[in-house]
Amino acid sequence: MGHNGSWISPNASEPHNASGAEAAGVNRSALGEFGEAQLYRQFTTTVQVVIFIGSLLGNFMVLWSTCRTTVFKSVTNRFIKNLACSGICASLVCVPFDIILSTSPHCCWWIYTMLFCKVVKFLHKVFCSVTILSFPAIALDRYYSVLYPLERKISDAKSRELVMYIWAHAVVASVPVFAVTNVADIYATSTCTEVWSNSLGHLVYVLVYNITTVIVPVVVVFLFLILIRRALSASQKKKVIIAALRTPQNTISIPYASQREAELHATLLSMVMVFILCSVPYATLVVYQTVLNVPDTSVFLLLTAVWLPKVSLLANPVLFLTVNKSVRKCLIGTLVQLHHRYSRRNVVSTGSGMAEASLEPSIRSGSQLLEMFHIGQQQIFKPTEDEEESEAKYIGSADFQAKEIFSTCLEGEQGPQFAPSAPPLSTVDSVSQVAPAAPVEPETFPDKYSLQFGFGPFELPPQWLSETRNSKKRLLPPLGNTPEELIQTKVPKVGRVERKMSRNNKVSIFPKVDS
């Protein structure tokens, strides 16, 4: 009995142990799901912070590039600016509150007040609608610019009216948010009330809004892109026919697509495709909560519907700045200019401290422009190897002639001697050559250019100095060391010219040479 009792007691306790194990398993699974949900919540918060910073920087750079450069037409620039402005507003209004709600759904109780919730939802709807409606406006402008490149189908006034219509449409489509409290939008899926009201008005509003503001604009964009592609493919035959006939016809409008147009088409198509792919979780959530009336939705689906649609806010400026070659060149050039300007400031600031230690010409110039000019002049008028050799020969010949003059002076003092007279120079030789200056002792007369520190308003440029007077790159005729030497230089007289008549009645001119 004891044994039987001991055998029965374990069997009797098995149901209790099984129920406890099941409860422990349920608790472990609940804790595991809660931990995974918290981890995914942290991931979504981090991603939204990155999207917030990148979207603001990217859209501001798009605005700067469209305002600074004239790469695109004024109408295209206006539509791109409108898209960038809506992205900035959506980032400032939508993302911060969703970051707070994703971090902790029960923090910041003032967010759940009815008035604040309605205002935030209204702004969410407006900026989301403006972003979506800007796509067909850009596609329409591209369609007209490709099919009619020499005409302006959309003027500046019409483009302004179209932008005003986009904002009016967005405001009208977002006004019912004040009447329907539990409305989810594409950027913020948190609702103003915890319990969903399964009213007919809510269902009608969701259907009308998504058809008129989301589905139809996306379909229009694809329709315009298909028409552009079809027109460009059909235009090749027209170009061949007109080129063969050599008779241009005014009635035929040949579509034109440059590299810039192709880049804009690729950018627009990429933006729309990214928007559609990122909106799939939001559409799934709307179908679950509105059409299928499923009250309990997965936390992962809700968080994915919160952060994934916001990727389009970051993708739009990134695609615009990277796909377009002209915009990319402008951006890179601006960054290079900023880098050069910053590096120059650093050089000037470090050079001011070095001026006290070393008295170099480039540091004492006092102006960065004069310093750069002085360096450029040195590079331009730097003598080549041939010029250095000719200059060395010229200096050697000048020293030899000076020694001859000095020896003849000594011989003249000792006694008169007859020396052969040198042949007279011609006029051309006298102009191209200058009498060499007498050698001067460096101790007696120091170099007058030794105190010059660089080219300034009261200094001679380097091409006028005596060291470079024989250079081929000089800007002035060769001069002596001083203006007095040029004045004292005498041009020898040319002998009388004789004219003789030949048998063919040709006049020959022979200069008279002293025998």
Curated annotation (Swiss-Prot):
Q: Which residues are glycosylated?
A: 4, 11, 17, 27
Tagged with keyword Cytoplasm: no
* Topology Cytoplasmic: residue spans: 64-82, 140-160, 229-267, 321-515
Q: Which GO terms describe its cellular component?
A: plasma membrane; synapse
Task: Please provide, alphabetically and separated by semicolons, the GO molecular function terms listed in this UniProt record.
Answer: G protein-coupled receptor activity
Keywords for this protein: Biological rhythms, Cell membrane, G-protein coupled receptor, Glycoprotein, Membrane, Receptor, Transducer, Transmembrane, Transmembrane helix
An example GO BP is: G protein-coupled receptor signaling pathway
Q: What is its main location?
A: membrane
Q: Could you tell me which CDD domains the record lists for this protein?
A: 7tmA_GPR176 (cd15006)
Q: Could you tell me the membrane topology recorded for this protein?
A: Multi-pass membrane protein
**Keyword Transit peptide on this protein?**
no
Q: Which PROSITE patterns match?
A: G_PROTEIN_RECEP_F1_2
The entry's localization annotation reads: Cell membrane
Topology, Extracellular side: 1-42, 104-118, 182-207, 289-299
The highest taxon in the source lineage is Eukaryota
Which chain regions cross the lipid bilayer?
43-63, 83-103, 119-139, 161-181, 208-228, 268-288, 300-320
Its biological function? Orphan receptor involved in normal circadian rhythm behavior. Acts through the G-protein subclass G(z)-alpha and has an agonist-independent basal activity to repress cAMP production.
Similarity section = Belongs to the G-protein coupled receptor 1 family.
Please give the name of this protein: G-protein coupled receptor 176
Q: Please report the organism this UniProt entry assigns to the protein.
A: Homo sapiens
